[in-house]
């Protein structure tokens, strides 16, 4: 029933200006319309989107807030590191990263925190035929100017 409609995610932030600087300058997001309370929307591929909104509860989740499906985790990690994004390292039962990247369960993944303490991830499917066919936009077109 609901699967036929687009889905949007929320990104809770304590400081909208600081968070916007991170998402727009380091991750290359292009802002959409502003929403009440100083929030902002961002549009992504395939009709997906997110809304950044101010709240004192930002960064309190210990789980990933969102993830992006990419076609090459190593390339994305390298590009984001070059822009100043720091990736998390994990060493626990069932999850061990090497140079910020974990491999297992048919995927590669890397996690980073935004300025508000939210955990975000990038994931590359190693088995999905859709992921293999996806064409990535030219890197320079994605970068914030």
Give the label of every model feature segment.
Residues 1-20, 63-66, 123-145:
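N-terminal beta-strand motif that seeds the catalytic metal site of vicinal oxygen chelate
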Residues 5, 38, 46-48, 62-64, ...:
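Residues that flank catalytic or metal-binding motifs in active/ligand-binding sites
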Residues 8-10, 41, 51, 65-67, ...:
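Short aromatic/hydrophobic contact patches that present stacked aromatics
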Residues 10-49, 56, 75, 82:
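Core segments of cupin and vicinal oxygen chelate
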Residues 15-17, 66-119, 125-130, 144-145:
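Vicinal oxygen chelate
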Residues 36-39, 60, 95, 105-106:
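Short acidic/glycine-enriched loop/turn segments that link adjacent beta-strands
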Residues 54-59, 126-128:
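A short, sequence-level motif marking secondary-structure junctions
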């Amino acid at each position: 029933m609901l699967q036929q409609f687009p889905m949007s995610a929320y990104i809770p932030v304590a400081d909208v200006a600081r968070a916007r600087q991170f998402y727009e300058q380091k991750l290359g997001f292009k802002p959409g319309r502003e929403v009440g309370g100083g929030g902002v929307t961002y549009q992504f591929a395939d009709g997906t989107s997110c809304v950044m909104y101010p709240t004192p509860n930002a960064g309190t989740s210990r789980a990933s807030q969102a993830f992006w499906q990419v076609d090459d985790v190593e390339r994305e990690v390298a590009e984001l590191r070059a822009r100043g994004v720091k990736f998390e390292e994990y060493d626990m039962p069932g999850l061990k990263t090497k140079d910020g990247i974990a491999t297992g369960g048919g995927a590669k993944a890397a996690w980073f925190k935004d300025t508000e303490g939210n955990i975000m991830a990038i994931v590359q499917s190693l088995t999905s035929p859709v992921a293999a066919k996806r064409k990535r936009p030219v890197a320079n077109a994605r970068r914030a100017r």
